[in-house]
A protein has these predicted regions:
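Structural signature of tandem-repeat unit edges
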Residues: 1-4, 12-26, 36-55, 63, ...
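Consensus positions within tandem repeat domains that build extended binding/scaffold surfaces
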Residues: 6-9, 29-31, 67, 86-89, ...
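Short, aromatic/basic amphipathic alpha-helical patches
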Residues: 201, 617-628
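Cleavable C-terminal sorting propeptides in eukaryotic secreted/cell-surface proteins
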Residues: 649-660
Length: 660
């Protein structure tokens, strides 16, 4: 029974009408995102939540207009009962003229976005217009504000064709990007009542005027500030360089965004700058000279995104936060130093992602977290020293960089090594001082690195799937005495073509037998080193299960013997890609064989003894487990098309070999 129509549910659907059944109690106005064919909406009269009048959807008492169909009409008079126009109510519609009702109080976010409104008079009754309400109305050339509003929200008139804006006395604040990307806007008149302007609220090169008693100031560089020049709001004229006065403590969001001619920012001596907000210098592609003041505590999201000419950044003692994508794409950035950082500091996701020239990274002892993708794709970064204060390294944090050595300082507070944190670091060979505090090594953590050996930290309890996948140089894997390791994921040694030995001298959870790693009572074989020289392997009757991917890629194995009354379950891909494997027997005790167990075992041509004659069991071996049809036939029945005839290896031979 349909009860809810969620956002984007009918995205780009070319429908002209829609009917809402009685039980629908939730309707997202943007469910038709990208569709401009809808002409009318109808509704079951017994629906307790919604009502329809003239093809337009309202709440039951018609106080909220929920959805105006995109292709309904070019002119519309909103009923007198309506007090609220809902989120995305008219979005992307053909409406050109609208008459507001006398009781209207609120217009929600994006209500008229991407419509064809030409001019707009906001009634005095309206007190609240939410973000983006008239964004991208590219036919809108004039707006008159009512007396009920006190603020203009973020993005409210962004990307319109307004030519002049006169802000009335009742408005005290204008949000971020409220009139940004308005290419025809040449003049803005502000009242004396304005106390707050958001970053990039107007386009550059606009003529802004305000009375002498306004709480704003404009310097000869055409930089707009608050009255005391504590907050730098925006720059109104493009130039190659600017001097920031010592009074400034905050640079507002998008203040210098996309100033592609800007090459230099100079901060006056003694400046107490604390915050550089989001997108402040976004896309300043020629900015090469900037010395961050020691007083800065935080950098906003993308504040220096794609500043491709910045070469070095030295952070000061007050730093506490570098936000998401802050320096992402700064492809000339060579040196990043946190050595003066005296306060606990976090580095958010993607902060230095794609800084392909970064060679020198110095992290201070006060860095507490490095989030996901933070230093990913830093193609010149060769060495990293992890400070003892660092508690968290996010997924992909250093992935796909050229790091050759990672050194952990002690005593470390590190608990987890996250998924993919050092994956694809194809030059990483040395991990120095791996902390004993680490409890979890997550999936793909060291995938495709060049580490030659690995000692599991004593406090580690779990290692995730594919943790060492593709570590082609690893020869030895050690679980030290008293190590707390209990859980080992699947495929952790996939592609470890040199791993010939697993060591586990004294563990409460594991034991080594015949080169393989078992659980403590030897009832479950967990994994076998892919590069082991052992060619024949015989299970003992004590073994009851083989874990998934246990023998994955063991290319030296020729024969495997499973005794009667032993193994009952073989996990998925357990013997996959054992390319030399020519013989294995499957006794009646084996009840469950998972998928892809024999995938890639191209030498299992014939002579495989399968005692279970059940058609369904054998069918599953072929269709799910990857065993070929001919493998269960006598080798004498196979035609000469097979170059190598296969002869089953006798049980007695296998037992003698293992004993030797």
């Amino acid at each position: 029974m349909l009860r809810s129509i969620e956002q984007y549910a009918m995205q780009s659907c070319k429908v002209e009408t829609i009917f809402l059944p009685k039980n629908v109690n939730s309707f997202a106005a943007n469910c038709f995102e990208g569709s401009r064919t809808l002409k009318t909406i109808s509704c079951n009269p017994s629906n307790p939540t919604f009502s329809v009048m003239d093809g337009v959807l309202y709440n039951k008492d018609k106080t909220t207009l929920i959805k105006f169909p995109a292709n309904h009409s070019t002119s519309f008079e909103i009923p007198e009962t309506v007090t609220t126009i809902g989120f995305c109510a008219f979005i992307s519609s053909v409406i050109e003229n609208v008459k507001f009702p006398p009781k209207l109080k609120r217009i929600d976010g994006y209500a008229f976005a991407v419509t064809k409104l030409k001019n707009l008079t906001i009634p005095d009754t309206i007190t609240d217009i939410s973000g983006g309400a008239f964004a991208s109305c590219q036919h809108l050339t004039e707006v008159k504000f009512g007396t009920g509003m006190t603020y203009i929200s973020n993005d409210c008139f962004m990307d319109t064709r307004l030519t002049k804006v006169v802000i009335p006395e009742n408005i005290t604040s204008i949000g971020e990007s409220a009139f940004s990307y308005c290419p025809n806007l040449k003049e803005v008149v502000l009242p004396s009542t304005i106390t707050s302007l958001g970053g990039s609220c107007f386009p550059t090169n606009v003529n802004i005027s305000f009375p002498s008693n306004a709480k704003l100031s404009l310097d000869d560089q055409q930089i707009l500030y608050d009255l005391d020049k504590i907050v730098l709001i925006m720059c109104l004229k493009k130039s190659t360089s600017y001097i920031i006065p010592e009074t400034v403590s905050t640079i507002r969001s998008s203040a210098f965004k996309d100033m592609t001619d800007l090459t230099k920012i100079e901060f006056r001596s003694g400046i107490t700058l604390k915050m550089i907000e989001s997108n402040a210098f976004y896309g300043c592609s020629k900015l090469s000279s900037i010395e961050i003041p020691n007083s800065v505590t935080s950098f906003g999201v993308r504040s220096f995104y794609n500043c491709a000419q910045i070469k070095s950044v030295f952070f000061g003692s007050k730093l506490t936060k570098i936000s998401t994508r802050c320096f992402e794409g700064c492809t000339s950035l060579d040196t990043v130093s946190f050595t003066q950082c005296d306060s606990p500091c976090t580095i958010d996701s993607y902060a230095f992602n794609g800084c392909t020239s970064l060679r020198t990274l110095t992290l201070s002892e006060n860095i507490s977290s490095i989030d996901m993708y933070c230093f990913s794709n830093c193609k010149s970064l060769e060495r990293v020293n992890i400070p003892s204060t660092l508690k968290y390294i996010g997924i992909y944090a250093f992935s796909n960089s050229l790091i050759s050595q990672v050194t952990f300082s002690s005593p470390s507070q590190m608990v987890n090594l996250s998924k993919y944190s050092f994956s694809q670091c194809i030059h990483l060979r040395d991990i120095v001082g791996t902390p004993d505090t680490i409890k979890n090594i997550e999936s793909n953590c060291f995938e495709s690195t060049l580490i030659t050996s690995f000692d599991v930290p004593i406090s580690t309890t779990s290692i995730g799937n594919y943790a060492f996948r593709g570590c082609s140089e690893m020869t030895v894997f050690r679980i030290p005495s008293r190590c707390l390791l209990q859980t080992i994921g699947n495929y952790i040694f996939d592609g470890c073509v040199s791993l010939s030995k697993i060591e586990c001298p004294d563990s409460d959870f594991f034991v080594i037998d015949n080169g393989a790693l078992f659980n403590k009572d030897r009832s479950n074989l967990i994994c076998f080193p892919p590069a082991s020289s052992i060619t024949f392997f015989c299970f003992s009757q004590n073994v009851k299960s083989v874990s998934s991917s246990a023998f994955y890629g063991c290319k030296s194995l020729v024969g495997i013997m499973i005794p009667d009354n032993s193994i009952t379950t073989i996990g998925h891909s357990a013997f996959a890609y054992c390319t030399s494997l020519k013989y294995i027997n499957i006794p009646l005790c084996v009840k469950n064989i998972d998928q892809n167990v024999f995938t890639g075992c191209n030498n299992l041509h014939c002579g495989i003894v399968v005692q279970n004659t059940s058609i369904s069991f054998r069918y599953s071996l072929v269709t799910n487990s990857g065993l070929s049809l001919t493998s269960m036939k006598d080798c004498g029945l196979i035609t000469c098309k097979h170059v190598n005839y296969q002869t089953p290896v006798s049980t007695s031979y296998l037992y003698v070999f293992i004993l030797m």
